[in-house]
Amino acid sequence: MATLANIAATRAQNDSQTGYNFLRLPVSAHAAALGGDNISVIDDDEALMFSNPALLSSVTDKSLNLNYMSYMQGSKVASAAFNKTFGERATAAVSASYIDYGKMKETDESNVQTGEFSAKDISIAGYFSYLLTDRLSGGVSAKFITSYIADYNSIAVGVDLGLNYYDPDREWSLSLALKNLGGELKAYDEDYNRLPFDMQIGASKRFTNMP
């Protein structure tokens, strides 16, 4: 029997100062069960690369990952990912994630309903990870992000950077991730939003023979 302990620290911008906060949501049930944004767990699960691109190095070649979840009332989250290894050290992957917020009431200035509208967010990304040493891996992802609210659309691009150190003998994993570096290319209006930048440090330790 093994028990997994996780420690994480994060520095993030205030949500009111940013857009595209759906990028912080977990894309799989496994990620949600680990706290929503775990950057240091070593597992053969492609969905973990959404949190830290360096974790792609631990995923089996030619893995296909599909996820679908309900999130809050009327919202749906879906993601898909596929990876390919190159030699013994390099791995590349592509992914797409999608959140549909469902139908919402459209009202006029007098709060009289005039119809309905929908909103959704989409992110398409490419990933590359590389084993720098037998225990240290680095990763980068580049994301194209678009958001729709009724007839309005915005577009942004972002980059994630990650490092992971894994000691298989002691089963210690240490990670650093810089997430959502980038900005908006097209805004809904004249006000441009920043991406929800996160700087995260995490550690995981697997304990055996514990009750």
Regions found by a protein language model. Give the residues of each.
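Outer-membrane beta-barrel porins/channels
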Residues: T10-G35, I39-V41, D61-L64, M69, ...
